[in-house]
């Protein structure tokens, strides 16, 4: 019979692989769409499109954390086989989202003109921006329901279906965006295309949810006002840390749009897109860990929960640090292959933001396991600290230094907020801060030989790489990756950082993992 450890491990690895496939596909489509948007819209309209998404992301957070709260509660209901509570949660939240959506449309539609006028937009672009931002309110309502059924499937640990829906709708997203831009419909056409894509995604998620939960029903008899308190109580506390994340990733775009020429929003966003690759890939793992941690916590299985935390932290650092070092080394190649030119402002954003984003990744298992077991009050305080620092530092530094001030302010806030979170977690759960830092240092040293080898290669490449040649830059980038990866794997084996426990946990899933174990002396 399959043991509990095997079931958790199998689901965790399966969901990680599905998340990896879905996110890599989505990253690829975003990288494809960005040069397309830039070529048709230009820098200023592209910046307006960035602000459209930034404002939409902020408004999504007005749900007071229902999204992540639902994942936790659905995971617990599923573990208990409680279909009645699932129906009550889905129906109650549907009613809440309808009420919230209608309220936001009525309240914000008239003031979008005032909001758009606050940004450094040219007069001929202002009215177009107003219509674009108003379209974002309609997209927002659809997104609320997408997030609801996405949470239902994630709570049942069916990341295969959520990612299938994501990949499926990405095709009409790319084709639709290209078509409306070719027709000359500009930002208005993109808003219509995005709304249609999210409606299609919602339809797919509902169909998948009915298959996973055949007992799923909606009806007035399932509305439970008493459930709202539990959902909001957990979600509101967790939401503070998520708002802090949103501020660190998006507030600078708003501040830049307010205080400096609008083109700097474009430069910042392009740098953030490259840096977000570092942030996004490890979060593939977190999305799979969160419901698994909730399930283990509901069973009081603390031994496997802490094994998940300790080993997960090591695997996370082994994955994220080479991506960070690789991003530092190859930022110029990435930009030349992607956009056809290297902008000093965009490259500077990549260096600062990738470092800041990595600080969040380095404590990612702290935040994810903590949220899974209900440890959210401290995350709320860390989020508040990070938010205040980010807004204060970025605003002051932008006024004093311009564009670079936003980069320095965000990096400072991320370093301080995540350091506080790690210290409090280790204190509350009797974990070792020194052990965490030693592991970070050890993995960094493992990366030193491949990083130095790659640096020598890049210095050699710089002597012959033609400026503006995308193909040559891509070839040089692939060559650097081809040099770094085998050198890194050899360094892992030589260092002995992986042990027999790792082989027992992952040996059935990762081909030839045993070859990375150091041979006994």
Stretch-by-stretch model annotation:
Residues 1-31, 84-92, 126-130, 205, ...:
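N-terminal membrane topogenesis motif
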Residues 12, 141-166, 188, 354-386:
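Membrane-interface junctions at transmembrane-helix termini in multi-pass inner-membrane proteins
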Residues 64-80, 94, 155, 213-217, ...:
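Helix-loop junctions and terminal segments of transmembrane helices
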Residues 14-31, 169, 193-201, 205, ...:
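Transmembrane helical elements of multi-pass membrane transporters/channels
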């Amino acid at each position: 019979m399959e043991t509990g450890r095997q079931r958790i491990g199998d689901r965790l690895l399966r969901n990680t692989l599905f998340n990896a496939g879905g996110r890599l596909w989505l990253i690829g489509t975003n990288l494809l769409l960005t040069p397309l948007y830039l070529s048709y819209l230009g820098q200023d309209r592209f910046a307006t499109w960035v602000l459209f998404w930034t404002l939409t992301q902020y408004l999504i957070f007005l749900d007071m954390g229902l999204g992540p709260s639902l994942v936790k509660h659905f995971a617990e209901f599923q573990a208990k086989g409680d279909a009645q509570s699932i129906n009550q949660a889905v129906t109650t939240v549907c009613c809440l989202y309808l009420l919230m959506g209608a309220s936001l449309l009525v309240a914000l539609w008239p003031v979008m003109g005032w909001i758009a006028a606050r940004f450094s937009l040219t007069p001929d672009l202002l009215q177009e921006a107003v219509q674009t931002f108003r379209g974002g309110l309609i997209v927002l309502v659809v997104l609320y329901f997408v997030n609801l059924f996405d949470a239902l499937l994630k709570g049942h640990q069916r990341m295969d279906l959520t990612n299938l829906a994501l990949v499926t709708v990405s095709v009409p997203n790319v084709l639709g965006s290209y078509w409306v831009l070719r027709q000359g419909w500009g930002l208005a056409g993109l808003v219509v295309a995005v709304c249609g894509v999210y409606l299609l995604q919602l339809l797919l998620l509902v169909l998948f949810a009915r298959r996973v939960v055949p007992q799923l029903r909606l009806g007035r008899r399932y509305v439970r006002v008493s459930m709202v308190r539990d959902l909001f109580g957990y979600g509101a506390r967790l939401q503070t840390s998520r708002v802090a994340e949103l501020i660190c990733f998006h507030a600078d775009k708003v501040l830049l749009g307010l205080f400096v020429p609008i083109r700097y929003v474009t430069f910042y966003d392009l740098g953030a897109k490259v840096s977000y690759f570092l942030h996004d890939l490890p979060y593939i793992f977190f999305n799979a860990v969160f419901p698994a941690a909730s399930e283990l916590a509901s069973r009081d299985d603390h031994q496997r929960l802490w094994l998940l935390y300790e080993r997960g932290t090591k695997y996370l650092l082994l994955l994220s640090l080479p991506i960070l070092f690789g991003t530092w080394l190859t930022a110029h190649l990435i930009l030349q292959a992607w956009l056809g030119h290297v902008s000093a402002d965009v490259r500077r954003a990549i260096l600062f933001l990738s470092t800041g984003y990595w600080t969040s990744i380095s404590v990612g298992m702290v935040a994810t396991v903590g949220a899974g077991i209900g440890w959210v009050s401290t995350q709320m305080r860390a989020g508040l600290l990070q938010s205040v620092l980010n807004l204060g530092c970025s605003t002051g530094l932008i006024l004093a230094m311009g564009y670079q001030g936003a980069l320095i302010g965000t990096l400072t806030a991320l370093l301080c907020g995540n350091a506080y979170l790690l210290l409090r977690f280790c204190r509350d759960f009797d974990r070792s801060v020194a052990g965490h830092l030693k592991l970070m240092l050890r993995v960094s040293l493992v990366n030193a030989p491949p990083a130095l080898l790659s640096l020598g290669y890049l210095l050699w490449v710089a002597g012959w790489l033609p400026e503006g040649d995308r193909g040559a830059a891509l070839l040089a980038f692939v060559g650097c990756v081809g040099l770094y990866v085998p050198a890194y794997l050899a360094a892992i084996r030589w260092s002995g950082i992986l042990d027999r426990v790792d082989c027992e946990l992952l040996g059935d899933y990762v081909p030839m993992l045993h070859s990375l174990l150091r041979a006994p002396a």
